[in-house]
Amino acid sequence: MEMASVFTLNVRLDNIAIITIDVPGEKMNTLKAEFASQVRAIIKQLRENKELRGVVFVSAKPDNFIAGADINMIGNCKTAQEAEALARQGQQLMAEIHALPIPVIAAIHGACLGGGLELALACHGRVCTDDPKTVLGLPEVQLGLLPGSGGTQRLPRLIGVSTALEMILTGKQLRAKQALKLGLVDDVVPHSILLEVAVELAKKDRPSSRPLPVRERILAGPLGRALLFKMVGKKTEHKTQGNYPATERILEVVETGLAQGTSSGYDAEARAFGELAMTPQSQALRSIFFASTDVKKDPGSDAPPAPLNSVGILGGGLMGGGIAYVTACKAGLPVRIKDINPQGINHALKYSWDQLEGKVRRRHLKASERDKQLALISGTTDYRGFAHRDLIIEAVFENLELKQQMVAEVEQNCAAHTIFASNTSSLPIGDIAAHATRPEQVIGLHFFSPVEKMPLVEIIPHAGTSAQTIATTVKLAKKQGKTPIVVRDKAGFYVNRILAPYINEAIRMLTEGERVEHIDAALVKFGFPVGPIQLLDEVGIDTGTKIIPVLEAAYGERFSAPANVVSSILNDDRKGRKNGRGFYLYGQKGRKSKKQVDPAIYPLIGAQGQGRLSAPQVAERCVMLMLNEAVRCVDEQVIRSVRDGDIGAVFGIGFPPFLGGPFRYIDSLGAGEVVAIMQRLATQYGSRFTPCERLVEMGARGESFWKTTATDLQ
């Protein structure tokens, strides 16, 4: 069967060739190896037509140019040589486009990422739209890879080595105006005249490359380059803790191209691409990418979602303010906040103002757009304006009677179809719905703080929640830009349940004499964004430890915190960053001062701060308990699948993405090895390390999680 055309060539009367990119049946244009023959055939036609004056690449998709290469191609490669051959094919194709004797212009609207930007870089000029959907970047590092079709060589020469390194090492995406300022594009225009401007540019001589700023020219020279790569290398090593091999290879490949010329650079790029594609880190990061894409397509239930036209929020605190912001500014839905105190409403409104004003200051948003988004948020101290809200999110104090009262008030003051979604982090949803007239419309919707930054939400139906309520709540979470996982209504749900033993063990090691900074550094080295003690300080010691007695009551002794430690800390008025003192001491608000461990913490908890454990031993104790609890959650069907378990841990806790999540990590170690480690730890430190039955059985049978299908919740 012949492949449908992805690249279509049309020659206009003014002898400008328009190449339209449109992958049939797909929302996004992605590049595949099998498209190469089509592109080569078009290049041949372009070379043969001596009348042509220029070429323009444009997308037929409404919101993307090319979103990147199809990642499945890499998964299909069995060896580094096969992946390297893919990169060389891409490089060759881009070189052929660049070698055309007439001007070639990329007309960019929407996402222009990865292989899409590499194609645009191979063109002689680039024009993009001023639309917010238009972003340009090379995000391959987020998949444990580097740009493999010439991006590591072309970008530094176009915009300068230090700017290019920042883009390639972080996967940072640029908006149109930023791209113009850096010289990545030649013009930014309204969408309506994009093609017209690109055609006019194609009629001129090839756009001459803009001279680089003096700083960039110095940094490209031998002395500047040596200094730059040394500094960037140090900074990158500190940030990645050596856990992401792609960053090291990016530096090596870019430097090779600058020092030895593009031919050596392209060769190094293709070779590094092939080798990185085979690393366990890249395989894990790609698995997270596929799993999150899969979760985003999951409707949550078989029922169709109800319409969502407006939302109400109860409580104007930190969580209420954050939820209002993502509902209005990401989902674009009108939001009405109810708080018993006008100050609460003002606080919530200021939260959105601060977020949007920050964007205006950074020139990511126009002031008029800020005002338009703010106009979606209103407040009240009673239920006026709540009568026709489709969904109410409750974000009041963690008090069961108060939340039950909120359910009763919403049922009395809102419509018969209104859904009540509680942002509780610890109370059973079934208990919150216990006295509801319409319990089928009560559900949990657990956000993580800070709401605008944390990508995960847990959606928690109780036994009586309807399928439509689940589907509607999932729909809202996606509109808010969140990745939702549906979890069972059991104490701690999923994320807090696997996090609690991890933090408990860190506190226990403190009481045994380990130092605060040693414990935190060990887990950062392992791959977490912050250590467990710092995390507790950031969340708030009072807030973070509130769930421990709930979990201990539900699951027993393995969740108990070291005796009297938490109460001693809280009785000493230590809440963490929010009041300036926890395990660490913080400088005055508004001043940039480094946090420091408070030495007074050790006598307070009856410890010496003179531990003997190595960093791997510290990490092992915390992480093994988290893995064991995650397996219990699959076994008890708290999560619907290991996919959701991995996504929940990576997006909700910051479990190291390069390990792929708890279940991928268990698979990489082998269940038998995890059981052996836990049995050793149980002998040394106590029964809380006893591996759960499911893990022991899988170890004995040599089974893996990702090769077995987790049973869906009924």
Swiss-Prot record:
Q: Which reaction does it catalyse?
A: a (3S)-3-hydroxyacyl-CoA = a (2E)-enoyl-CoA + H2O; a 4-saturated-(3S)-3-hydroxyacyl-CoA = a (3E)-enoyl-CoA + H2O; a (3S)-3-hydroxyacyl-CoA + NAD(+) = a 3-oxoacyl-CoA + NADH + H(+); (3S)-3-hydroxybutanoyl-CoA = (3R)-3-hydroxybutanoyl-CoA
For this UniProt record, give its keywords in alphabetical order, as a comma-separated list. Cytoplasm, Fatty acid metabolism, Isomerase, Lipid degradation, Lipid metabolism, Lyase, Multifunctional enzyme, NAD, Oxidoreductase
Q: Which GO terms describe its cellular component?
A: cytoplasm
Q: Its GO biological process terms?
A: fatty acid beta-oxidation
Q: Where is the stretch described as 3-hydroxyacyl-CoA dehydrogenase?
A: 306-714
Looking at the record, which segments are called Enoyl-CoA hydratase? Answer: 1-190
| GO molecular-function terms, A-Z | 3-hydroxybutyryl-CoA epimerase activity; enoyl-CoA hydratase activity; long-chain-3-hydroxyacyl-CoA dehydrogenase activity; NAD+ binding
Pathway(s): Lipid metabolism; fatty acid beta-oxidation
> What PANTHER family does the database record attribute to this sequence?
TRIFUNCTIONAL ENZYME SUBUNIT ALPHA, TRIFUNCTIONAL ENZYME SUBUNIT ALPHA, MITOCHONDRIAL
Matching NCBIfam families, A to Z?
A: FadJ, PRK11154.1
Assembly and interaction partners: Heterotetramer of two alpha chains (FadJ) and two beta chains (FadI).
Kindly provide the name given to this protein in its UniProt entry: Fatty acid oxidation complex subunit alpha
Can you name the source organism? Answer: Escherichia coli (strain SE11)
- Designated gene of the protein: fadJ
